[in-house]
From Swiss-Prot:
Subcellular location: Cytoplasm
Principal location listed in the UniProt entry: cytoplasm
Organism: Pseudomonas fluorescens biotype C
Name recorded for this polypeptide: Ferrochelatase
CDD domains in the cross-refs: Ferrochelatase_C, Ferrochelatase_N
Pathway: Porphyrin-containing compound metabolism; protoheme biosynthesis; protoheme from protoporphyrin-IX: step 1/1
């Protein structure tokens, strides 16, 4: 074993489904300035208001999808970590969560204490967003600075357009698309429009189509919405899907600010009203199934679709611990550029 570790980083999860644990997790998550990008006093006030009712509501949602082994996101991430140990030959493979445990700080501190000198930091997010990729990188920077750790980093870049990722996504989903269905909906996690406007002022996010169809490469590099459409378009091309067989929407809105559109809730209703009876839903913003896929789409989305006139909603599993995904991820991590 060499001194080059691979650190997989996912979002995180409450320690349990108790209201207290969910409140603690939500507080850490929502107080991240990359998640709610408001001045600290305003953010603190807003989060305090959210934490009045949201922990109990979220605890109920977590309880509905919790596994015997624990949080699905954590369990599936652990399984991927195990798969990666057979792929990554340069050193240990570790797992950290941006929020909750195991923390980035605890894992990096332990690795440095074990004599590790190089770390490939792998944020497990196909598309770029400050609230996912940037916050992971900045937290690693903070830990290295505050703990004075002597670590050299390579950083996995967003891989939404990489053939290895797309091929693994197609291979994983193909069995589900070989059954009869009326429509495939790609439901990506949403973001407030202001997050994107800060990165690319003046870039139009209007309409229901790809906002980056005619954008410059510089804009595409940081436009989360355009990268989501890119994934859907490339997937559809690989599967030979006609344009009227698939569409894109964005889920998980929080608060009153305008988020990127079209919204998944509205799209579910519209598809049902258009006569779609059997709907497949993929969530390619996530590489592991979690509360946003299992509960928000698999449970609440199904209920909403049926209430609008649909009959069956099939949630296509995320990549999770698929062996081809592990091979693809290893390839992507091996060519990650040196940074930090």
């Amino acid at each position: 074993m060499t001194d080059h570790a691979l650190l997989l980083v996912n979002l995180g999860s409450p320690a349990s489904t108790s209201v207290a644990d969910v409140r603690s997790y939500l507080n850490q998550f929502l107080m991240d300035p990359y998640v709610i990008d408001l001045p600290w006093p305003v953010r603190r006030l807003l989060v305090s208001l959210i934490l009045i009712k949201r922990p109990a509501q979220s605890a109920h949602a977590y309880a509905s999808i919790w596994w015997d082994e624990g949080s699905p996101l954590v369990v599936l991430s652990r399984r991927l970590q195990q798969q990666m140990t057979a792929q990554w030959t340069q050193g240990p493979v570790e797992l950290a969560m941006r929020y909750g445990e195991p923390s980035i700080e605890s894992v990096l501190t332990r690795l440095a204490g074990q004599g590790i000198s190089k770390v490939t930091l792998a944020p497990l997010y196909p598309q770029f967003a400050d609230s996912t990729v940037t916050t992971v990188i900045e937290e690693a920077r903070r830990v290295v600075r505050d703990k004075q750790l002597d670590l050299q980093f390579s950083i996995l870049q967003p891989f939404y357009d990489q053939p290895e990722y797309l091929d693994a996504l197609v291979a994983s989903a193909r069995p589900h698309l070989q059954q009869d269905y009326d429509h495939l909906l790609f439901s990506f996690h949403g973001l407030p429009e202001r997050h994107l406007n800060k990165l690319n002022p003046g870039h139009s996010l209007e309409g229901s189509g790809d906002c980056c169809a005619n954008a410059s490469p510089e804009v595409r590099t940081t436009c989360y919405r355009g990268q989501c459409f890119s994934v859907a378009r490339d997937f559809a091309a690989r599967m030979g899907l006609p344009d009227d067989k698939w569409s894109v929407a964005f889920q998980s809105r929080l608060g009153r600010a305008k988020w990127i559109e079209p919204y998944t809730e509205a799209r579910l209703e519209a598809l049902a009203q258009q006569g779609v009876k059997k709907l497949l839903v993929m969530c390619p913003a996530f590489v592991a199934d979690c509360i946003e896929t299992l509960e928000e789409i698999g449970d609440r989305g199904l209920e909403q679709f049926r209430e609008a006139g649909g009959e069956e909603l099939v949630l296509v599993p995320c990549l999770n611990d698929d062996p081809q995904w592990a091979v693809a991820l290893n390839t992507l991590c091996e060519r990650a550029p040196v940074s930090l």
